[in-house]
Structure formats: structure tokens, C-alpha cells
Curated annotation (Swiss-Prot):
The gene is lepA. Its EC number is 3.6.5.n1. The keyword Cell membrane applies. This is Elongation factor 4. It is a peripheral membrane protein. It comes from Alcanivorax borkumensis (strain ATCC 700651 / DSM 11573 / NCIMB 13689 / SK2). GO terms for biological process: positive regulation of translation. It is an enzyme of class 3 (hydrolase). Pfam families: EFG_C, GTP_EFTU, GTP_EFTU_D2, LepA_C. Belongs to the TRAFAC class translation factor GTPase superfamily. Classic translation factor GTPase family. LepA subfamily. GTP binds at D17, H18, G19, K20, S21, T22, N134, K135, I136, D137. It comes from the Bacteria.
Length: 599
């Protein structure tokens, strides 16, 4: 077994596309974790979706052995982290298991907002942060400028930052040497009682729940009886080991090491992420401080297309929740869509990914309603209510004031695009808090309503700045504002799944836009279909989908006009009867139309 002073636990922090997964590949190659044949690009992005979108979603871990120049062999436990803003909680989780972090910055692009946010998370957790410049093989790389940026924006001392190219493998050895030298060894006594932190869990159909753990104190071996602190349940360890990136069994895990444990836990919530494991015979070991539970920012209704899939859908959600601690769900029924769940997400990317994972990994067809954020209502009775579903809003007369969540948004953008970004923030009802020039970049801080941020702000900001701006956001507070619920009526019936909450100033416009969009999507019937948008009992917009009609007077050649009138009158009455009993099928696209009502 490796001596504790020769263990190094670290993770890599970087913005999307700054090359952390490729750097991980190089580490694995240099330390001989996989044979040449098994090495595919981005080994750690094991989920199909991750490979397809080229982003890291789940944290992964790898244990490598590296023989340094001083002849010692070090055990490197490397935990990969995602870079996208929606997954920042995954990052804080990975970091809590490490003593150090590599801050990887693209030498051509410079510092970006997510790296700043994640870097502060690392510094708050007292980790040793090493700056690394990646992609120095690119002709447009400007290492000197980027080093200044790191020092100015983040305040890290970066004059001796390692310069590497993960793609070509330049400088990787020096980086590993620096890593071994500067990142501290874990603290912990192997003789004391077991104390281990669960970093991540996932469900395997054969082995039950498998947990990724970081052993802080003591040791864990096969056959041990372990106790999960929060649930109080005990399990016997069936197998444990490390990832090399393949799952490899070992005899024991000791203080300072990171590895996986399986205890044939069949209950999906048997090993919650952030929990502490200890031996059953030492139940009063203190629980480790877990990570803060993340509150979902966006809620949407998800409904299976066919009602028979409801049970499968429920099981699939339960399995995903195990793997993704930030997912929240509760059952919901809708008149238009039947039984389903109200699911909470961290942001729109997270929502898309969960929906794709449900559709791919569990073979489900789902309809998703328009996402909403959580609003706070002060009622006339003095109660405070939190609402995440437009159809659950009480009547207007009962509401004293409406409060919407405000997000503090930090944006880093090159100087030439500042104007566009500011315009966008103002359109989104943002209030400027701060603005400072740092080298070639400008740091903007805005308070923007969460509802405006989560939907497509990220995409919009990328498009107005040609992809150079980067942002990160966090919930700040609730603020009173004028909001209304816009209902959609089809032939006078409310469709609950299409309701949306928006600002009073935008309501007439959004109602009109939605009706126009719906008119294109609702198929023509045998009778006129009226599509209306209403606030309370006041109709603010209307579109009519015209009826299909047969030309009943075609068979009359000449003849008396009263004959034609009679036929037309008869047709009219038929249509009227149809309209009373007919109901309109609303296609799936129409529910998504609510999302696409552009500003």
C-alpha cells in the first residue's frame, strides 16, 4: 500500500473547452493507466451524451501511479469536474475530496467566468491551486498576457505557471512533478476509526448502489460492516477498489485514498451523496461536513406521452436522482397531459441533459412543459407562499405582492463586445452593480431576474459576443415586482399546461406572440378554433384557426339564390353543433411553443 505522504488528491478546474478532459487523457497515458488499444479520446467522459456534446457532466475519478524524478512512486487520485455553469455543484463536490486543484486556462482564450467561480470555490475550501496554461501549441496562444490575466482577475500567483499542451503532450512531465511537489499530502491516521465521505453514487443493475468515496480516517476492507450516518442503516462491504479508469477491485482502501465501494445496497437512497460512512462498531464517529444541498432554480412538468409509461418513468427518475443529487421531483397531474412529475433542475442545460438521459437510457417518450422559476408570494392573509407552477397560483385578489428571484450574474467579456452585452442585460430588466476593466477583458456584474437568466440568457450572451463572453450566476434574493399569469384558452377552455408567468409590461406582447405561434401549430379542424390569451378574465389577444369547409353549393348550377342560402345555412348549423362537442388535440410542439416566444 502507498504511504499516506505519497498520496496526492487533486481535481482539474477549467472553463468549458479549455481542455481538462484531454489533459486527463494525457495523465492516464503517461502513468500507464490504460493500454494503447483502450485509449480513446476523453476517456473519462463515459456517458454517450458527454461524448456527443463534448462536455463533462458527471464527476469521475481515476487512480494513477506516477514515479517521480526523486525515485518515489506517488499515488495520484484525480477527480474530473464539469466546467459548465449548471454543474457547479458537481465541482464543489469533487473539490471537497481533494487537497489541491489545477486551474487550467486556455492560453489562447484567457480567463473565463466559470474558471473564476470554481477557483474561488477551491480557495474557500483551502485547496492549493496550481495555475496551468494549456494549448500552448496553438499559434494564437499568448501565455504572458494570460498569466497577467490570472493574476489580475483571480489574484493567483501565476508567474511560474506550468505551460503544457495536452494535445501534443508537451510539458506534462513537468506538470506532474510540480503537482507532486506543491500539492500537500492528505492528513489522516490509518489507525483511527473509519470516516469516509461519499462524493458520488450511481446505480448498477447487478451490484446495487456503488459509491465513490474519499477515506478521511481509518481503513475500509472487504467484509467490513459499514454504517451510513444519515440513514443509520448498516451494510456489508461486498467489494471495493479503485478506478484505473476501469473499475478494479483491491483489498482495502486507507486514509487519504479515493475509491469505490459496493455494499449491495438495493435501496436507491441508501447512500446519499455528501454522507459519511463509518464502521458499524464505531457509530459515534462525527459526520463530515457534507456539501450544501443545491436548490433547483428551474422547474418544469414532465409527462410520459403514453400513460402506461408512468411507472417506468418514476423508477428512471429515482435512479437518476441517486446519480445526480441536485435533481428534485414530485408527482403532478395536469388536465391536458395526465399524470407526470414536477421536476426541479439547476438550469436549462441541466434540464436538456436530464431529458435526453431519460429518453436514451430509459427509453421514455416525454412531454416537457415550459420551465418556470420559483416565485415568492405574500398573500393578503399574511402567509408567504412559494410557487413553481403557474397553474398553482392563487387568484389575483388574494395576492398582496409578487416577488421574483433575482440572480447576481458575473460576466467576463472582451472590450469590443461590451456594448452588445450591456444592451442584452438591459433588455432582460437587469440592473448594473459593477463594471471594471481588467486587461483586455471587462468584468460586468448585474442583478437580473432569474426567469430571464435561466431560459436562454447563456445562449444569447454567446451569440451577441461571438462566443467570447462567459458568465456565471447565483441566486441573490427575492424582490417585489409586477407579475401576472397569462392563461391560454382554446375554444374557451383553459389549458393548464400552457399558462406562463411574466412581467406586466411584457404580458400583452408575449400573449400576442404566443397566440400567433399557437395558430401555426394547432391543426385545422372542421370548426373554427379560437385561441385566446387572458390575464384573469381580461382577454389580451386572440387568433382564430379557420375551419375546413366543404363547398356545398358546388352542385347548384344557376338556380335560385334561396337554394344556396338553405345549403349554407344547413352547413353552418352542422358546424355549430360540432363545435359544441368537438375537442381539439393539441400537438406536442404547441407545448414547446411557450418556450420559443422570443423577445
Amino acid at each position: 500500500m502507498t504511504d499516506i505522504k505519497n498520496i496526492r488528491n487533486f481535481s482539474i478546474i477549467a472553463h468549458i473547452d479549455h481542455g481538462k478532459s484531454t489533459l486527463a487523457d494525457r495523465f492516464i497515458q503517461v502513468c500507464g493507466g490504460l493500454s494503447e488499444r483502450e485509449l480513446k479520446e476523453q476517456v473519462l467522459d463515459s456517458m454517450e451524451l458527454e461524448r456527443e456534446r463534448g462536455i463533462t457532466i458527471k464527476a469521475q475519478s481515476v487512480t494513477l501511479h506516477y514515479t517521480a524524478r526523486d525515485g518515489e512512486t506517488y499515488q495520484l487520485n484525480f477527480i474530473d469536474t464539469p466546467g459548465h455553469v449548471d454543474f457547479s455543484y458537481e465541482v464543489s463536490r469533487s473539490l471537497s475530496a481533494c487537497e489541491g486543484a489545477l486551474l487550467v486556462v486556455d492560453a489562447a482564450q484567457g480567463v473565463e467566468a466559470q474558471s473564476v467561480a470554481n477557483c474561488y470555490t477551491a480557495i474557500e475550501q483551502d485547496l492549493e491551486v496550481l495555475a496551468v496554461l494549456n494549448k500552448i501549441d496553438l499559434p494564437q496562444a499568448e501565455p504572458e498576457m494570460v498569466i497577467n490575466e490570472i493574476e489580475e482577475i483571480i489574484g493567483l500567483d501565476a508567474h511560474d505557471a506550468c505551460r503544457v499542451s495536452a494535445k501534443t503532450g508537451v510539458g506534462i512531465d513537468d506538470l506532474l512533478e510540480q503537482l507532486v511537489e506543491r500539492i500537500p499530502a492528505p492528513e489522516g491516521k490509518r489507525e483511527s476509526d473509519l470516516q469516509a465521505l461519499i462524493i458520488d453514487s450511481w446505480f448498477d443493475n447487478y451490484m446495487g448502489v456503488i459509491s465513490l468515496v474519499r477515506v478521511k480516517e481509518g481503513r475500509l476492507k472487504k467484509g467490513d460492516k459499514i454504517l451510513v450516518k444519515s440513514t443509520g442503516q448498516t451494510h456489508v462491504v461486498d467489494s471495493l477498489g479503485i478506478f484505473t479508469p476501469k473499475r478494479t477491485e483491491t483489498k482495502l482502501l486507507e486514509a487519504g485514498e479515493v475509491g469505490w465501494v459496493s455494499g449491495s445496497i438495493k435501496d436507491i437512497h441508501g447512500a446519499p451523496v455528501g454522507d459519511t460512512l463509518t464502521l458499524a462498531k464505531t457509530p459515534n464517529v462525527a459526520a463530515l461536513p457534507g456539501f450544501k444541498n443545491v436548490k433547483p432554480q428551474v422547474y418544469a412538468g414532465m409527462f410520459p406521452v403514453s400513460a402506461d409509461d408512468y411507472e417506468d418513468f418514476r423508477d428512471a427518475l429515482a435512479k437518476l436522482t441517486l446519480n445526480d443529487a441536485s435533481l428534485f421531483y414530485e408527482p403532478e397531474t395536469s388536465d391536458a397531459l395526465g399524470f407526470g412529475f414536477r421536476v426541479g433542475f439547476l438550469g436549462m442545460l441541466h434540464m436538456e441533459i436530464i431529458q435526453e438521459r431519460l429518453e436514451r437510457e430509459y427509453d421514455l417518450d416525454l412531454i416537457t412543459t415550459a420551465p418556470t422559476v420559483v416565485y415568492e408570494l405574500a398573500l393578503v392573509s399574511g402567509d408567504i407562499l412559494h410557487v413553481d407552477n403557474p397553474s398553482k397560483l392563487p387568484e389575483g385578489s388574494k395576492i398582496e405582492e409578487f416577488r421574483e428571484p433575482i440572480a447576481r450574474v458575473n460576466i467576463l467579456v472582451p472590450q469590443e463586445f461590451v456594448g452588445n452585452v450591456i444592451t442584452l442585460c438591459v433588455e432582460r430588466r437587469g440592473a448594473q452593480i459593477n463594471m471594471q476593466y481588467l486587461g483586455k477583458q471587462v468584468a460586468l456584474t448585474y442583478d437580473i431576474p432569474m426567469a430571464e437568466v435561466v431560459l436562454d440568457f447563456f445562449d444569447r450572451i454567446k451569440s451577441v459576443s461571438r462566443g467570447f463572453a462567459s458568465m456565471d450566476y447565483a441566486f441573490e434574493r427575492f424582490e417585489a415586482t409586477k407579475l401576472v399569469r397569462v392563461d391560454v384558452l382554446i375554444n374557451g377552455d383553459k389549458v393548464d399546461a400552457l399558462a406562463m408567468i411574466c412581467h406586466l409590461d411584457q404580458s400583452a406582447y408575449r400573449g400576442r406572440a404566443l397566440c400567433e405561434k399557437m395558430k401555426e401549430l394547432v391543426p385545422r379542424q372542421m370548426f373554427d378554433v379560437a385561441i385566446q390569451a387572458a390575464i384573469g378574465s381580461k382577454i389580451i389577444a386572440r387568433q382564430t384557426v379557420k375551419a375546413l369547409r366543404k363547398n356545398v353549393t358546388a352542385k347548384c348550377y344557376g338556380g335560385d339564390v334561396s337554394r344556396k342560402k338553405k345549403l349554407l345555412q344547413k352547413q353552418k348549423e352542422g358546424k355549430k353543433r360540432m363545435k359544441q362537442v368537438g375537442n381539439v388535440e393539441i400537438p406536442q410542439e404547441a407545448f414547446l411553443a411557450v418556450l420559443k416566444v422570443d423577445d
